[in-house]
Structure formats: structure tokens, C-alpha cells
Amino acid sequence: MDLYENQRSTSKIKRDASVNDRIPDGLFLACPYCGTQMYNKQLGDYRVCAKCGYGFRLQARERVALLTDNFEEMDADIEMTTPDFPGYAEKLARAKSQTDLGESVLTGVANIEGEQVALGVMDSYFMMGSLGSMTGEKITRLFEYATAHQLPVVLFTASGGARMQEGINSLMQMAKVSAAVAAHQEAGLLYLVVLTDPTTGGVTASFAMQGDVTLAEPHALVGFAGARVIESTIHEKLPKDFQRVETLLENGFVDKIVPRAELGQIIAKIVKLHHRTEI
């Protein structure tokens, strides 16, 4: 029996201190809609859930790179005086640094599948895409340029609503942009909206719902007040998908839900069709 005694090894595996065994942030993600856990690279270039088709949120420049053949930015350097709200200047500076944008919307002239359009893309990473004075000014100028140059407007909406730090000046942008939209439409020009996740608040209450054609990405959240606010007001539980674009489609507020990878082709087809009706 002595042959089998004290044979257990007492040596220990040494850990290489130079190796970082921590899983990097963002390596695995959960789909905000269906909850599926997936490896980051499974999303692909379009950052879409392989199970349900939900499009993860994109920064404005990412979307422009995926969507357009070429893009020339407008009004990149315009600035407006910001209100003296505590901490606002610091938040603006941080948002500009994180997104490489001057405001929560990127505007310019683009070619999509060979069709020239005036393009606006809101960015939810810039202070939740909130509607500030500069945001409204840039979108207004986009419509004015499009009207003067007889171009269709394609606007991707993504917003948490009015920017509270700017008070009434933020709310005024709803009417300001709406007036520019009306002038563009009176000129017989096409305004195409693409609703993305999330589109809420004052943006939903104004120019997001004024398009001649309204497209949407799958499972995007679109509404005015948040679900919890509504439930606390009416004291009822809201139905599943109450503020999702699938419900809006069923009730006539959206014309078509389009997978992100197909948006360029669909937008180009609609623009071409509108050109034919003008002849």
C-alpha cells in the first residue's frame, strides 16, 4: 500500500501576471428587444440582431457610411449661444468629443444608390438625440436648401425629445422645422422619414410624423411619453409592443418596416418613383 500513498502532486499552476483574463466590455451583447445574448461580431456591419432583426443604435457617421455612396456635410461649423444652465456646456463638450459631431444631427447632400438627396441623420449618442436650438436650425437649413435646389429630403429620426436645458427655445424648434417641412412639401418635393430606435417626445410630435412616406426599422421604439409615464397616468398596464413600429404599422402611422440592410435600395426606389410622377 505504501506504493500508492502520498502520490498527489502538490505543485501549483502558475498564473502569468502579464495576461489580462478579464472579458473586455462590449464583447458580448444582449438584444434590447428579444434579449438574445450574442457575440459582438455576430451583429455584422449593420449591427442587427440575427434572431429578431432589431437594429442596434448607430452613430450618425456610422449610418451615413453604411447608407450612402458619397456624402458632403452641411453646416458643420455653425454655432449658437448656449444658455447658462448648470453643467450644460460640459455635457455639450463631452457629447461632441464622443460623437465627432457639433450637434445631435448630421446633415448634408448624399447619393443613395445613385439618387441625390438632402440627408439628415439624428444621433442618439449625442445627448440622447435631444432637440436643441442648433438641431432645429440645422434641420431647418437642410429643408431650405432642399427646397431651393429641388431635392428630396431623407431624415433618420432618433431622439429622446426636447432638450430640457434649453427650455422654450427647444420647444420652438418643433414649429420652426414644421414650417420648413411645409414649405418643402408645398414645392411638390418628397420628404421621406425613417423612424429609428428611439424616436420620442417633441420629435415624434412634429417633423417625425410629417413625412410623405414613413419607413421604420424593425422593433424601433416610437412614441411621445414613456411607457412608465403613461401607465402611472392611466393606472393600466400597456399592451406588449404598444410603442413599437409594428403597432404603428398596424394602425396606419407607418408605411413600411424595412430591415436596415435594405434601406438604401428602398429609399432609392421611392425617390425614383417620385421623380417619375413629376414628369
From Swiss-Prot:
Q: Outline the extent of the CoA carboxyltransferase N-terminal domain.
A: 27-279
Give the GO cellular component terms, alphabetically.
Answer: acetyl-CoA carboxylase complex
GO BP annotations of the record are: fatty acid biosynthetic process; malonyl-CoA biosynthetic process
Q: Signal sequence: where?
A: none
InterPro entries given for it? AcCoA_carboxyl_beta (IPR034733), Acetyl_CoA_COase_Trfase_b_su (IPR000438), ClpP/crotonase-like_dom_sf (IPR029045), COA_CT_N (IPR011762)
Q: Which stretches does the record call C4-type zinc fingers? A: 31-52
Cofactors demanded by this protein: Zn(2+)
Write out the annotated subcellular location: Cytoplasm
Give the E.C. number(s).
2.1.3.15
State whether it acts alone or in a complex, and with which partners, per the record: Acetyl-CoA carboxylase is a heterohexamer composed of biotin carboxyl carrier protein (AccB), biotin carboxylase (AccC) and two subunits each of ACCase subunit alpha (AccA) and ACCase subunit beta (AccD).
PANTHER family linked to this entry: ACETYL-COENZYME A CARBOXYLASE CARBOXYL TRANSFERASE SUBUNIT BETA, CHLOROPLASTIC
Output this protein's name: Acetyl-coenzyme A carboxylase carboxyl transferase subunit beta
- Origin organism of this chain? Leuconostoc citreum (strain KM20)
